[in-house]
């Protein structure tokens, strides 16, 4: 029996999600940024999804961003926070997601951010 222990990185796709996505993976696969008909249908689906997520979270659709994955999401969140709130110091650990460490490292190398690392021991 195989046991998968990396659900923090990638999880199995829920069958309900797969069924909802099949049309967009097979027939309606247009680029939502394109101006042609297939692209516009894809754009409509993305916007409908944005409104659905916003409604579930009691948020504005303008506050919902879809990204390609953790790296892009982490970069947007960190860069936005650092710039918007004029963050000059970040505290993290060496166990943090690689994308977070790379983004913080880049800001540190550019002299825009001091980064401190908490020590990790057997208790966390």
What do the predicted segments below correspond to?
Residues 1-124:
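Pyridoxal 5′-phosphate
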């Amino acid at each position: 029996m195989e046991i998968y222990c990396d659900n923090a990185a990638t999880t199995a796709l829920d069958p309900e999600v797969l069924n909802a996505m099949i049309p967009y993976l097979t027939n309606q696969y247009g680029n939502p940024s394109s101006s042609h008909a297939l692209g516009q249908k894809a754009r409509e689906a993305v916007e409908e999804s944005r409104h659905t997520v916003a409604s579930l979270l009691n948020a504005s659709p303008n506050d919902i961003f879809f990204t390609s994955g953790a790296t892009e999401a982490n970069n947007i969140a960190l860069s936005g926070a650092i710039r918007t709130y004029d963050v000059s110091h970040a505290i993290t650990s060496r166990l943090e997601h690689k994308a977070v460490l790379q983004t913080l490292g880049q800001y540190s190398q550019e002299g825009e951010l001091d980064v401190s690392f908490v020590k990790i021991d057997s208790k966390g």
